[in-house]
Amino acid sequence: MAFTKSKQPRKQRKALFNAPLHLRRKVMSAMLSKELKEKLGKNAIPVRKGDVVRIMRGDFKGLEGEVIKVDLKRYRIYVEGANNKRQDGREVPYPIHPSNVMIIKLYDKDEKRFKHIKNE
C-alpha cells in the first residue's frame, strides 16, 4: 500500500496523518501467530474488534485479551485487561499501537472477512 512514492520522511508522515479511513485500516495490521500464519498463508492482517491478541511490547507485555475498540483516527487499539488507573480511581483502557501485538485468535463470526483474507 503506497500512500506516496516519495522517500522523504516528512511526506511519508504527512501521508499517514492525512490518510482516509479506508487506507488507515490497512496500516492497523498486526502480525499473526504461527498457527494462523500457516492456516491463512499471511504474516499480518488488519486488527478488528473481537480478535484475541497478545501484547508483545510495553508495560502490558504478555497480556492476552480481546480487542474492545479499534481507533482508526489515532492508530490505536484497546485490549481487554490493559487499563490505567486514573487519579480518581477509575480504570481507563490503555491505547496500544497494533504493531506491538500479535493476533492469536480471529473473530470468527464474520465469514465475509475470511473470504476477503483468502482472496488477498
UniProtKB/Swiss-Prot annotation:
Keyword Protease set for record: no
Subunit-structure text: Part of the 50S ribosomal subunit.
Gene: rpl24
UniProt GO MF annotations: RNA binding; rRNA binding; structural constituent of ribosome
The name this protein goes by in its record: Large ribosomal subunit protein uL24
Domain of life: Archaea
One Pfam entry name: Ribosomal_L26
Similarity field: Belongs to the universal ribosomal protein uL24 family.
Family annotation (PROSITE patterns): RIBOSOMAL_L24
Record-linked InterPro entries: KOW (IPR005824), Rib_uL2_dom2 (IPR014722), Ribosomal_uL24_CS (IPR005825), Ribosomal_uL24_euk/arc (IPR005756), Ribosomal_uL24_KOW (IPR041988), Translation_prot_SH3-like_sf (IPR008991)
Stated role: One of two assembly initiator proteins, it binds directly to the 5'-end of the 23S rRNA, where it nucleates assembly of the 50S subunit. Located at the polypeptide exit tunnel on the outside of the subunit.
CDD domains the UniProt entry points to: KOW_RPL26
UniProt keyword annotations, A-Z: Ribonucleoprotein, Ribosomal protein, RNA-binding, rRNA-binding
GO BP term, example: ribosomal large subunit biogenesis
GO cellular component terms listed in the entry, alphabetical order: cytosolic large ribosomal subunit
Key word RNA-binding present: yes
